[in-house]
Protein backbone atom coordinates (compact mmCIF):
# COMPACT_ATOMS: atom_id res chain seq x y z
CA UNK A 1 0.00 0.00 0.00
CA UNK A 2 1.31 3.47 -0.86
CA UNK A 3 0.30 6.55 1.10
CA UNK A 4 -0.33 10.16 0.22
CA UNK A 5 2.14 12.70 1.60
CA UNK A 6 -0.27 14.44 4.00
CA UNK A 7 -0.37 15.09 7.71
CA UNK A 8 -3.12 12.95 9.24
CA UNK A 9 -4.63 13.43 12.70
CA UNK A 10 -6.84 10.98 14.57
CA UNK A 11 -8.48 10.61 17.94
CA UNK A 12 -6.60 7.92 19.85
CA UNK A 13 -8.40 5.76 22.40
CA UNK A 14 -6.94 3.50 25.05
CA UNK A 15 -9.10 0.42 24.64
CA UNK A 16 -8.12 -2.07 27.34
CA UNK A 17 -4.45 -1.09 26.88
CA UNK A 18 -4.63 -1.15 23.06
CA UNK A 19 -4.23 1.96 20.85
CA UNK A 20 -7.33 2.36 18.67
CA UNK A 21 -8.24 5.01 16.09
CA UNK A 22 -11.53 5.28 14.21
CA UNK A 23 -11.59 5.99 10.47
CA UNK A 24 -14.94 6.24 8.67
CA UNK A 25 -16.59 4.28 11.46
CA UNK A 26 -13.94 1.54 11.33
CA UNK A 27 -12.16 0.72 14.59
CA UNK A 28 -8.47 0.27 13.82
CA UNK A 29 -5.96 -1.18 16.30
CA UNK A 30 -2.42 0.12 15.69
CA UNK A 31 -0.14 -2.91 15.95
CA UNK A 32 3.60 -2.52 15.36
CA UNK A 33 3.97 -6.17 16.34
CA UNK A 34 2.22 -7.34 13.16
CA UNK A 35 4.13 -7.25 9.86
CA UNK A 36 0.86 -7.10 7.93
CA UNK A 37 -2.60 -5.54 8.09
CA UNK A 38 -5.59 -7.84 8.63
CA UNK A 39 -9.35 -7.61 8.99
CA UNK A 40 -11.21 -9.09 11.92
CA UNK A 41 -13.50 -11.92 10.70
CA UNK A 42 -16.41 -9.51 11.25
CA UNK A 43 -14.54 -6.52 9.83
CA UNK A 44 -14.73 -4.82 6.41
CA UNK A 45 -13.33 -6.40 3.26
CA UNK A 46 -11.45 -3.22 2.38
CA UNK A 47 -10.01 -0.18 4.12
CA UNK A 48 -9.60 3.36 2.86
CA UNK A 49 -6.88 5.23 4.72
CA UNK A 50 -4.20 7.72 3.69
CA UNK A 51 -5.99 8.28 0.39
CA UNK A 52 -5.72 4.64 -0.67
CA UNK A 53 -8.22 1.79 -0.60
CA UNK A 54 -6.98 -1.77 -0.25
CA UNK A 55 -8.61 -5.15 0.18
CA UNK A 56 -7.86 -6.76 3.50
CA UNK A 57 -6.88 -10.37 4.16
CA UNK A 58 -8.60 -12.01 7.10
CA UNK A 59 -6.59 -12.48 10.26
CA UNK A 60 -5.29 -16.08 10.51
CA UNK A 61 -7.64 -17.18 13.28
CA UNK A 62 -11.21 -18.45 13.35
CA UNK A 63 -14.17 -16.16 13.94
CA UNK A 64 -15.06 -17.94 17.17
CA UNK A 65 -11.49 -17.66 18.44
CA UNK A 66 -11.28 -13.95 17.60
CA UNK A 67 -14.66 -13.21 19.19
CA UNK A 68 -13.63 -15.06 22.35
CA UNK A 69 -10.28 -13.24 22.32
CA UNK A 70 -11.97 -9.85 21.97
CA UNK A 71 -14.31 -10.64 24.85
CA UNK A 72 -11.45 -11.78 27.07
CA UNK A 73 -9.28 -8.74 26.26
CA UNK A 74 -12.21 -6.36 26.69
CA UNK A 75 -12.05 -4.57 23.36
CA UNK A 76 -13.05 -5.04 19.73
CA UNK A 77 -11.39 -3.94 16.52
CA UNK A 78 -12.40 -4.12 12.87
CA UNK A 79 -8.90 -3.85 11.38
CA UNK A 80 -5.43 -4.63 12.74
CA UNK A 81 -3.13 -2.04 11.15
CA UNK A 82 0.31 -3.58 10.76
CA UNK A 83 3.76 -2.41 9.77
CA UNK A 84 3.11 -2.74 6.03
CA UNK A 85 0.91 0.36 6.35
CA UNK A 86 2.57 2.04 9.32
CA UNK A 87 6.25 1.79 8.27
CA UNK A 88 6.25 4.40 5.45
CA UNK A 89 5.20 7.13 7.91
CA UNK A 90 6.24 8.71 11.18
CA UNK A 91 3.66 8.34 13.96
CA UNK A 92 3.12 10.29 17.17
CA UNK A 93 0.93 8.57 19.77
CA UNK A 94 -0.27 10.32 22.91
CA UNK A 95 -2.69 8.38 25.09
CA UNK A 96 -2.95 11.18 27.66
CA UNK A 97 -4.03 13.71 25.03
CA UNK A 98 -6.04 11.15 23.06
CA UNK A 99 -4.30 12.00 19.78
CA UNK A 100 -2.43 10.21 17.02
CA UNK A 101 -0.61 11.80 14.10
CA UNK A 102 0.90 10.26 10.98
CA UNK A 103 2.95 11.96 8.28
CA UNK A 104 6.07 11.39 6.14
CA UNK A 105 7.92 13.55 8.70
CA UNK A 106 6.92 15.06 12.03
CA UNK A 107 8.62 18.05 13.68
CA UNK A 108 10.90 17.37 16.62
CA UNK A 109 9.53 18.40 20.01
CA UNK A 110 11.25 19.79 23.08
CA UNK A 111 11.95 17.47 26.01
CA UNK A 112 12.07 14.46 23.69
CA UNK A 113 14.75 11.78 23.96
CA UNK A 114 15.65 10.17 20.64
CA UNK A 115 16.90 6.60 20.34
CA UNK A 116 17.99 4.62 17.27
CA UNK A 117 15.18 2.32 16.16
CA UNK A 118 16.51 -0.21 13.65
CA UNK A 119 13.95 -2.68 12.28
CA UNK A 120 14.26 -6.08 13.88
CA UNK A 121 15.19 -9.07 11.74
CA UNK A 122 16.61 -6.62 9.19
CA UNK A 123 13.20 -6.24 7.55
CA UNK A 124 11.53 -2.88 6.95
CA UNK A 125 8.09 -4.10 8.02
CA UNK A 126 9.05 -5.91 11.22
CA UNK A 127 8.53 -4.85 14.83
CA UNK A 128 10.67 -1.81 15.77
CA UNK A 129 13.48 -2.32 18.26
CA UNK A 130 15.59 -0.25 20.64
CA UNK A 131 18.11 -0.78 23.44
CA UNK A 132 17.15 -0.55 27.11
CA UNK A 133 18.75 -0.85 30.56
CA UNK A 134 21.85 1.21 29.72
CA UNK A 135 22.06 -0.37 26.28
CA UNK A 136 22.65 -3.85 27.66
CA UNK A 137 19.40 -5.38 26.38
CA UNK A 138 17.33 -5.31 23.19
CA UNK A 139 13.61 -4.57 23.34
CA UNK A 140 10.92 -4.78 20.68
CA UNK A 141 8.05 -2.28 20.85
CA UNK A 142 4.71 -3.92 20.11
CA UNK A 143 1.85 -1.42 20.35
CA UNK A 144 -0.62 -4.30 19.97
CA UNK A 145 0.49 -5.93 23.24
CA UNK A 146 -1.58 -5.04 26.31
CA UNK A 147 1.12 -6.47 28.57
CA UNK A 148 4.90 -6.31 28.26
CA UNK A 149 6.86 -9.56 28.21
CA UNK A 150 10.27 -10.65 29.45
CA UNK A 151 12.15 -13.03 27.19
CA UNK A 152 14.42 -15.33 29.17
CA UNK A 153 15.25 -15.18 32.87
CA UNK A 154 13.11 -12.98 35.10
CA UNK A 155 15.27 -10.24 36.71
CA UNK A 156 16.04 -10.79 40.38
CA UNK A 157 14.65 -7.33 41.17
CA UNK A 158 11.18 -8.18 39.82
CA UNK A 159 8.20 -8.59 42.16
CA UNK A 160 5.34 -10.99 41.51
CA UNK A 161 2.05 -9.13 41.01
CA UNK A 162 -0.55 -11.79 40.28
CA UNK A 163 -1.68 -13.66 37.19
CA UNK A 164 -3.05 -12.60 33.82
CA UNK A 165 -4.69 -14.09 30.76
CA UNK A 166 -3.75 -12.97 27.28
CA UNK A 167 -4.61 -13.81 23.69
CA UNK A 168 -2.68 -13.76 20.44
CA UNK A 169 -4.06 -15.03 17.11
CA UNK A 170 -0.93 -17.16 16.56
CA UNK A 171 -0.41 -18.33 20.15
CA UNK A 172 -4.06 -18.60 21.15
CA UNK A 173 -5.09 -18.14 24.80
CA UNK A 174 -2.48 -18.41 27.52
CA UNK A 175 -1.91 -17.54 31.17
CA UNK A 176 1.16 -16.00 32.74
CA UNK A 177 2.46 -14.86 36.08
CA UNK A 178 2.79 -11.07 36.12
CA UNK A 179 5.81 -9.29 37.56
CA UNK A 180 6.56 -5.63 38.21
CA UNK A 181 9.96 -3.97 37.89
CA UNK A 182 11.65 -0.81 36.65
CA UNK A 183 13.15 -0.49 33.18
CA UNK A 184 15.54 2.19 31.92
CA UNK A 185 15.09 3.51 28.39
CA UNK A 186 16.82 6.57 26.97
CA UNK A 187 17.86 7.66 30.46
CA UNK A 188 14.27 7.46 31.75
CA UNK A 189 13.24 4.90 34.35
CA UNK A 190 9.67 3.65 34.03
CA UNK A 191 7.62 0.96 35.79
CA UNK A 192 6.75 -2.10 33.72
CA UNK A 193 4.27 -4.92 34.25
CA UNK A 194 5.26 -8.00 32.35
CA UNK A 195 4.63 -11.68 31.87
CA UNK A 196 6.34 -14.54 30.05
CA UNK A 197 5.32 -15.71 26.59
CA UNK A 198 4.59 -19.37 25.86
CA UNK A 199 7.71 -21.18 24.73
CA UNK A 200 6.56 -21.19 21.10
CA UNK A 201 6.38 -17.41 21.12
CA UNK A 202 9.62 -16.84 23.01
CA UNK A 203 11.97 -19.14 21.09
CA UNK A 204 12.37 -16.94 18.00
CA UNK A 205 12.85 -13.81 20.08
CA UNK A 206 15.48 -15.56 22.17
CA UNK A 207 17.33 -16.52 18.99
CA UNK A 208 17.34 -12.83 17.98
CA UNK A 209 18.85 -11.81 21.30
CA UNK A 210 15.70 -9.98 22.40
CA UNK A 211 15.16 -9.53 26.15
CA UNK A 212 11.92 -7.52 26.22
CA UNK A 213 8.70 -7.15 24.29
CA UNK A 214 7.39 -3.76 25.40
CA UNK A 215 3.66 -3.21 25.13
CA UNK A 216 1.39 -0.57 26.61
CA UNK A 217 3.88 0.44 29.34
CA UNK A 218 5.68 2.70 26.87
CA UNK A 219 2.47 4.44 25.78
CA UNK A 220 1.45 5.06 29.39
CA UNK A 221 4.78 6.65 30.26
CA UNK A 222 5.53 8.69 27.14
CA UNK A 223 4.24 10.70 24.24
CA UNK A 224 5.81 8.34 21.70
CA UNK A 225 7.11 9.25 18.25
CA UNK A 226 7.76 6.31 15.95
CA UNK A 227 9.81 7.86 13.16
CA UNK A 228 9.98 4.82 10.92
CA UNK A 229 11.49 6.63 7.88
CA UNK A 230 14.20 8.11 10.14
CA UNK A 231 14.58 4.87 12.14
CA UNK A 232 14.40 6.61 15.49
CA UNK A 233 12.17 6.46 18.55
CA UNK A 234 11.15 9.65 20.36
CA UNK A 235 10.14 9.54 24.03
CA UNK A 236 8.65 12.60 25.71
CA UNK A 237 7.64 11.95 29.33
CA UNK A 238 3.94 12.60 29.87
CA UNK A 239 4.66 15.09 32.65
CA UNK A 240 6.61 17.18 30.08
CA UNK A 241 3.78 17.12 27.49
Labelled PLM ranges:
Residues 1-241:
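Pepsin/retropepsin-fold aspartyl endopeptidases
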Amino acid sequence: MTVQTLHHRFELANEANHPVITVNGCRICLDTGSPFTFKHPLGPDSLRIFGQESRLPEIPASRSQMEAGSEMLGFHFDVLLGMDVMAPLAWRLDWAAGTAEAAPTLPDEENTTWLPMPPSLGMAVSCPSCRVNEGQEVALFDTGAQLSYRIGTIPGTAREAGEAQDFNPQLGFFETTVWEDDLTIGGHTIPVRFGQLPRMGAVMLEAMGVSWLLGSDLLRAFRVTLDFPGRRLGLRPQEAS
